[in-house]
Curated annotation (Swiss-Prot):
It comes from Rickettsia prowazekii (strain Madrid E). The lineage of its organism: Bacteria, Pseudomonadati, Pseudomonadota, Alphaproteobacteria, Rickettsiales. InterPro entries: Cation_efflux, Cation_efflux_CTD, Cation_efflux_CTD_sf, Cation_efflux_TMD_sf, CDF_Transporter. PANTHER family: CATION-EFFLUX PUMP FIEF, MITOCHONDRIAL METAL TRANSPORTER 1-RELATED. It is a multi-pass membrane protein. This is Protein p34. GO terms for cellular component: plasma membrane. Gene3D superfamilies: Cation efflux protein transmembrane domain (1.20.1510.10), Cation efflux protein, cytoplasmic domain (3.30.70.1350). It comes from the Bacteria. Pfam families: Cation_efflux, ZT_dimer. It is found in: Cell membrane.
C-alpha cells in the first residue's frame, strides 16, 4: 500500500470519528425530546459507530506501518482484530436494542415531538451521506477492508435513519410501529455483525482463500509450460493482503537460474490477480515425493 493510500485511509478515519461524534450528540438530543424507541436504537447504533471509528483510527496507526524486525509479515492483521472486536460490540448492542424495543411493545408508549425528531433525523442522514460517499471513494482507490467495515456501519446507520423517520411518523396512527421498528433495526445490526465476525475470524485463524481465488492461482500455474506439478499450496488473508506459498515441481535437469526465472514469471502473473500479495515459491525436482503432504494437482 503506497503513501497516497495511507493518507486517504487516515483522512477518512478522522472524518469518520468527527462525523460520528456530531451525529451521536444530535441523536441524543432527538431521543430526549421524543422518547422514541427507534431513535434510541439508532442512538445505540451511533454509539457503536463512534466506538468502532475510534478503534479503527487507533488500529490504523499500527496496521499501516511497514513490516519491522518483530513483525516481518507486516501489521495487516491488526485490521482483522479490530473488525472482530467491533462485531462483538455490535452483537451486544443488537441484544440491548432488541430487549428495550420488545419491552416497549408491552408498555404501549409512543414518541413525542415528532416533527422535531424528523428534522433532526434528516440532518443525521445528510451528514451520513457525505461520509459514505467519501468512504466509497477511498475504498475504490485503496480496497481497504477496515474502511469497508466502517462504511457498512454508516450505511446501516443511513438505513436505520430512514426506518426511524418512517416509524416515528407512523406512530401517531399505530402506537406499536416505533418499538416494532426498533426490533427490526436490532435484527439488522445482528446480521451485519455476523458478516463482519465471520470474515475477520477466518482471517485471524488463517483460513484458506476462497476456492475461486485458489483456482485462479492453480490456473496460472497450470498454464506455464515449465511446471510439471504443484504441491503444498497454502494461502491466507491478512486484511486485504493475500499470502500465497507453494512448491512447484520442475524438470530436475534445468539450471537453478531457469527454475528461478519460471518462479518469477508465475509470481508476476499471480500479482496481476492479487495486487500486493506476498508470494513464496519453492522449487522441487519433478518426481520426488518426499515431504508431500497434499498435492493440488499434476499438470503433466
Amino acid at each position: 500500500m503506497n503513501n497516497s493510500h495511507h493518507r486517504l485511509i487516515k483522512s477518512v478515519s478522522y472524518l469518520s470519528v468527527t462525523t460520528a461524534l456530531i451525529i451521536l450528540i444530535i441523536k441524543l438530543y432527538a431521543w430526549v425530546v421524543t422518547s422514541s424507541q427507534s431513535i434510541l436504537a439508532s442512538l445505540i447504533d451511533s454509539m457503536l459507530d463512534i466506538t468502532s471509528s475510534f478503534i479503527n483510527l487507533v488500529a490504523l496507526r499500527f496496521a499501516l506501518q511497514p513490516p519491522d524486525h518483530y513483525h516481518r509479515f507486516g501489521h495487516e492483521k491488526m485490521q482483522d482484530l479490530t473488525i472482530f472486536s467491533q462485531s462483538i460490540f455490535f452483537f451486544a448492542s443488537a441484544f440491548f436494542v432488541g430487549f428495550a424495543s420488545v419491552k416497549s411493545l408491552f408498555i404501549k408508549t409512543k414518541p413525542e415531538n415528532i416533527s422535531d425528531g424528523t428534522i433532526i433525523m434528516y440532518l443525521c442522514m445528510f451528514l451520513t451521506i457525505i461520509l459514505v460517499l467519501y468512504q466509497t471513494y477511498v475504498i475504490k482507490k485503496t480496497g481497504s477492508e477496515i474502511v469497508k467495515a466502517d462504511k457498512l456501519h454508516y450505511f446501516t446507520d443511513l438505513l436505520t435513519n430512514v426506518i426511524v423517520i418512517i416509524s416515528i411518523n407512523l406512530s401517531d396512527y399505530f402506537w406499536f410501529v416505533d418499538p416494532l421498528f426498533g426490533v427490526v433495526i436490532s435484527l439488522y445490526i445482528f446480521h451485519s455483525s455476523y458478516s463482519l465476525f465471520k470474515k475477520a475470524f477466518k482471517n485471524l485463524v488463517d483460513h484458506e482463500l476462497p476456492e475461486q481465488d485458489r483456482q485462479k492461482i492453480i490456473s496460472i500455474v497450470n498454464n506455464h509450460s515449465g511446471v510439471k506439478g504443484m504441491h503444498e499450496m497454502k494461502t491466507r488473508y491478512a486484511a486485504q493482503k493475500a499470502f500465497i506459498q507453494c512448491h512447484l515441481e520442475m524438470d530436475g535437469n534445468i539450471s537453478l537460474y531457469s527454475a528461478h526465472k519460471i518462479s518469477d514469471e508465475i509470481a508476476f502473473e499471480i500479482l496481476q490477480k492479487f495486487p500486493e500479495a506476498e508470494i513464496i515459491i519453492h522449487q522441487d525436482p519433478f518426481g520426488i515425493e518426499e515431504h508431500v503432504n497434499y498435492r493440488e494437482y499434476i499438470v503433466r
